[in-house]
């Protein structure tokens, strides 16, 4: 039985929101290379892939602080040094996606959902300047109608603001929405938004099993979302399906829109 069949009583969610790093793509090798290059320029020892794998998930500024502290807690880091180190990291990572790969089943799942008419959004804590180039290189960006980076809004996950915004824009309630992620921040954001969360066992959760965060379901492969493992599923229907707009428009939310976002969220939360 697929995740959709378990969570939505034989129906598809109308909206599926995805995390990026650790969910759709394994970006740790490139992130680790950028972190190590940053550390070497600061006269420090490189951290290595396994350490970086436990540090990612809360955005680039926190990753840099953890690398400087050489610990997950990121304590005792000088703010000025952290700011300079972040510039070094950003420069190193800007065009560094050669080692990043799409996880098995990700492309097939996105393609299947797109064919079923399910709206999709990408909500990541990765700085937005890195998101579009990565999606283009991985050839998965066209599937997402809304793309929100970690610095697009004043809040990032685990704050649910981005989830509320996407649901508002899609006119889809939480009961017909799903979030797919791999970390504690993803699960907390989904729970705060009243959205079911499916978590991937293989992602980045600071070395802790994602099941400890109590998502609605844990899966080992994105194909597990799909009825019949990507086979046609005539028995699975969209609830109250709304015809999609003509064309394949993609909305990349920018910082210029954040005031409108906050106002919209405030009105929506008040009505709720």
Curated annotation (Swiss-Prot):
Signal peptide (from-to): none
Among CDD domains, the record links this protein to: HAD_PGPase (cd16417)
- Where, by residue number, is the active site? 19 (nucleophile)
Any one of the GO CC terms: cytosol
Kindly state which keywords UniProt assigns to this record, in alphabetical order.
Carbohydrate metabolism, Chloride, Hydrolase, Magnesium, Metal-binding
* Protein's pathway: Organic acid metabolism; glycolate biosynthesis; glycolate from 2-phosphoglycolate: step 1/1
Q: Which residues bind Mg(2+)?
A: 19, 21, 182
Which InterPro entries did the record assign? HAD-like_hydrolase_sf, HAD-like_sf, HAD-SF_hydro_IA, HAD_2, HAD_sf, PGP-like_dom2, PGPase_prok
- Give one Pfam family, short name only: HAD_2
Catalytic reaction list: 2-phosphoglycolate + H2O = glycolate + phosphate
Molecular-function GO terms, alphabetical: metal ion binding; phosphoglycolate phosphatase activity
Enzyme Commission identifier(s): 3.1.3.18
- UniProt superkingdom: Bacteria
Respond yes or no to whether keyword Metal-binding is given for this record.
yes
Q: Nucleotidyltransferase: is it a keyword of this entry?
A: no
Cofactors, names only: Mg(2+)
The GO annotation for biological process reads:
carbohydrate metabolic process; DNA repair; glycolate biosynthetic process
> Which family, according to the similarity comment?
Belongs to the HAD-like hydrolase superfamily. CbbY/CbbZ/Gph/YieH family.
Its annotated function is as follows: Specifically catalyzes the dephosphorylation of 2-phosphoglycolate. Is involved in the dissimilation of the intracellular 2-phosphoglycolate formed during the DNA repair of 3'-phosphoglycolate ends, a major class of DNA lesions induced by oxidative stress.
Please give the name of this protein. Phosphoglycolate phosphatase
Native species of this protein? Answer: Pseudomonas fluorescens (strain ATCC BAA-477 / NRRL B-23932 / Pf-5)
Taxonomy of the source species: Bacteria, Pseudomonadati, Pseudomonadota, Gammaproteobacteria, Pseudomonadales
């Amino acid at each position: 039985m697929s995740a959709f069949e378990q969570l939505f009583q034989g129906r598809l969610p109308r909206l599926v929101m995805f995390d990026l790093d650790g969910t759709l793509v394994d970006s740790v090798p490139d992130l680790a290379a950028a972190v190590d290059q940053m550390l070497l320029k600061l006269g420090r020892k490189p951290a290595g892939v396994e350490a970086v794998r436990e540090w990612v998930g809360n955005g680039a500024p926190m990753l840099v602080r953890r690398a400087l502290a050489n610990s997950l807690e990121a304590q005792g880091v000088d703010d000025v040094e952290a700011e300079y180190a972040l510039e070094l990291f950003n420069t190193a990572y800007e065009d560094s996606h050669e080692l990043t790969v799409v996880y098995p089943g990700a492309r097939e799942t996105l393609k299947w959902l797109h064919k079923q008419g399910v709206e999709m959004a990408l909500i990541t804590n990765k700085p937005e300047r890195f998101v579009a180039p990565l999606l283009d290189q991985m050839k998965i960006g066209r599937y997402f109608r809304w793309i929100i980076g970690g610095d697009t809004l004043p809040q990032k996950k685990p704050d649910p603001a981005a989830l509320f915004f996407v649901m508002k824009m899609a006119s889809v309630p939480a009961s017909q929405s799903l979030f797919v992620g791999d970390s504690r921040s993803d699960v907390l954001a989904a729970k705060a938004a009243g959205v079911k969360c499916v978590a991937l066992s293989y992602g980045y959760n600071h070395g802790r099993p994602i099941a400890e965060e109590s998502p609605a379901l844990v899966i080992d492969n994105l194909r597990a979302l799909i009825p019949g493992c990507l086979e046609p599923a005539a028995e699975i229907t969209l609830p109250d399906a709304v015809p999609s707009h003509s064309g394949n428009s993609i909305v990349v939310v920018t910082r210029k829109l954040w005031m409108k976002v906050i106002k919209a969220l405030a009105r929506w939360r008040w009505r709720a």
